[in-house]
Amino acid sequence: MSCSSLCAPACVATPTPLADSCNEPCVRQCPDSTVVIQPPATVVTFPGPILSSFPQYAAVGSAGVPAVGSGMGGTFGRGAGFGGYGGLGGYGGYGGLGGYGGYGGFGSCGYGGFGRGYRSLLGSCGPC
């Protein structure tokens, strides 16, 4: 006895967007069962069972190396902007490697980062 799949096609991960999730119902219909009762010969057909599930799928990833940019977002989340290499949440900005909460800024040798201390205007750290 084989069951035919009535499931929707699976989600396909693509580079854009960087986060994707799916909730898709899946239903399988199996063939009917037949029983012969003797004597006298009587045929009774029982409907095949319907099996259902609700699989969940989620993927979060990166589309590759972020582009270097500038401004309020470097573009928003990459580059040298609000969430990227030199911005409010990235490599050299407000929350990144050289910024407010990251590796070399107001948070590395500063508030909330790897060390304790501060960062001067010249870029040198105090007591880290």
Swiss-Prot record:
Gene Ontology molecular function: structural constituent of cytoskeleton
Alphabetical keyword list: Keratin, Repeat
Tissues of expression: Abundantly expressed in the claw and at a low level in feather tissue.
Cellular compartments per GO CC: intermediate filament
Listed InterPro entries: Keratin
Keyword Phosphoprotein: no
Signal peptide, first to last residue: none
Keyword Repeat in record: yes
Region feature 3 X 9 AA tandem repeats, Gly-rich, mapped onto this chain: 83-104
Sections of the chain in a coiled coil: none
Sequence repeat residues: 83-91, 92-100, 101-109
Note: The avian keratins (F-ker, S-ker, C-ker and B-ker) are a complex mixture of very similar polypeptides.
Membership in a protein family: Belongs to the avian keratin family.
Protein's name in the database: Claw keratin
